[in-house]
């Protein structure tokens, strides 16, 4: 019977563990500002959804989805603070940095799904355009714009700030950059404002508000309700185009790929490591992105037998640590050159295979220090046998070795005449011509037909 625990601790549910971690984050004063903005975001989102229903404007609904995306960005910021508080565990030896990447990926994908929903609703509205009420359309636009800009500029969101700079530019940023260059050519003083790469979130907030203002004016002047649907499609396309590069970048990080902009630097460092003193070969190198701005990697280094392991390890780590923050280096020492062994077809003039033995070699290392599997000194830091280099495998052909020890003819294994006269063409296997001596190969189980025959006229021992 197993051990009976009288006072077993109750297992917490998923929501209980989530509440415990939320309390851990809420105890930090840095998260109070984020929680305050989150509460304001929920209030503004509730009012905006009511105004979307009263105005019947799908363009305002598409712009409200950007406010919901701001809520996701605040949650991502809380996750970032939680990752900073948590330490690596045995189950997660690399830490919890990938949760930031997962939060960014989920937020951008949800924003793109919202944009696709707006496109689907807009396609239905083109068939039957409803009437749009402009009572709270302009008010909702300025409320959403003010809150979005205030949130993006007040909260330092490290994950999204890194992704917005590292990901490729969206088509909206490229078009705005072209317009900025043309404008700065006319007014050079604006180059410090428009020429740097604009924040994609601020850019889409301003572009969406501009589209809603045009919608309001056209509906008020000409009662042109179809412009609301056109503005919704424009906002959805801008949202999708802005979020897509970020989702692609964060998805590649989740797939543990190597960033393209560091591949050349890593190749240069690997070549430098291969030229270090004592290093014979660098193999099985693998580098991937662990989190935003942090690389992890592993590499196997084969060194000379007389090289200092600690010195080589220090030099390799010093070279690669400039790019790879989490590095695993496995050091292997080169094997001694083994003596050449006879393998393959046997010459016809070899008559007695029992006169072969293993060539005696002087001991190179003590038997206590060697590993019989790999012929490598056994030490606590040595690799397992399956990782040793140039280790004979199980596919080695049988080996016949010289042996000076003589064996008597006929060991009582008389099973009749041996059927291999076609192999030895010198008459050794034919009765009456000569004695056929026993064979000893690298195999331990000798078939019964490889027996011995008696000499003619010689009594058996």
UniProtKB/Swiss-Prot annotation:
Highest taxon in the source lineage: Eukaryota
Gene Ontology cellular component annotations, sorted alphabetically: Golgi apparatus; trans-Golgi network membrane
Keyword Methyltransferase appears in the UniProt entry: no
Ranges where the record places region Disordered: 362-393
Record key words, sorted: Golgi apparatus, Ion transport, Membrane, Transmembrane, Transmembrane helix, Transport, Zinc, Zinc transport
One Pfam family recorded for the sequence: Cation_efflux
Sequence ranges on the Cytoplasmic membrane side: 1-33, 86-98, 156-200, 245-461
Cellular localisation: Golgi apparatus, trans-Golgi network membrane
Example GO molecular function: zinc ion transmembrane transporter activity
InterPro entries for the chain: Cation_efflux, Cation_efflux_TMD_sf, CDF_SLC30A
Low complexity composition bias: residue spans: 370-379
Bilayer-crossing regions: 34-54, 65-85, 99-119, 135-155, 201-221, 224-244
Residue ranges that the UniProt entry lists as topological domain Extracellular: 55-64, 120-134, 222-223
Major site of localization recorded for this protein: Golgi
GO biological process assignments: regulation of zinc ion transport; zinc ion import into Golgi lumen; zinc ion transport
Topology of the protein relative to the lipid bilayer: Multi-pass membrane protein
UniProt xrefs under NCBIfam families: CDF
Subunit structure: Heterodimer with SLC30A5; form a functional zinc ion transmembrane transporter.
Function of the molecule: Has probably no intrinsic transporter activity but together with SLC30A5 forms a functional zinc ion:proton antiporter heterodimer, mediating zinc entry into the lumen of organelles along the secretory pathway. As part of that zinc ion:proton antiporter, contributes to zinc ion homeostasis within the early secretory pathway and regulates the activation and folding of enzymes like alkaline phosphatases and enzymes involved in phosphatidylinositol glycan anchor biosynthesis.
PANTHER family named among the record's database cross-references: ZINC TRANSPORTER 6
Family to which the UniProt record says this protein belongs: Belongs to the cation diffusion facilitator (CDF) transporter (TC 2.A.4) family. SLC30A subfamily.
Protein name as annotated: Zinc transporter 6
Gene that specifies this protein: SLC30A6
